[in-house]
A protein has these predicted regions:
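Acidic, low-complexity, intrinsically disordered interaction modules
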Residues: 26-97
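Negatively charged, low-complexity tracts enriched in Asp/Glu with abundant Ser/Thr
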Residues: 2-31
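Short acidic DE-rich linear segments
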Residues: 99-104
Length: 104
């Protein structure tokens, strides 16, 4: 179960990624959208954090960011923009289909 403190921390991460999304120029990066998804497994209470980049043309890149600090998330975004992480798509889709998405 997400505690109020945990929700506050996750909200900061979501808002950080939203703010970065607003300043990443699509014409130079081909990034259509950048977002931070949080899911909760209602059975175990465990939460999953994913950084998601949707590219112009339909490609997607996913990165698990469970427990990462904001500075590490920033580094992950840089890595995703440079080369991407496609191997975590299956994990993301399993979590997305089996867990409740937390809305901020």
């Amino acid at each position: 179960m997400l505690t109020p403190e945990r929700i506050k921390t996750l909200s900061k991460k979501v808002n950080f990624v939203k703010a970065l999304s607003a300043v990443i120029p699509a014409y130079q990066t081909n990034v259509e959208s950048l977002h931070y998804d949080v899911f909760e497994d209602e059975e175990t209470g465990y939460d999953y954090e994913y950084l998601v980049i949707d590219y112009v043309g339909g490609a997607h890149s996913y990165r698990s960011c469970n427990g990462n600090s904001i500075s590490v998330i920033f580094e992950e975004i840089a890595g995703m923009l440079d080369s991407g992480y496609y191997e975590e798509e299956r994990d993301y889709n399993v979590v997305k289909s089996s867990c409740r998405k937390i809305k901020f």
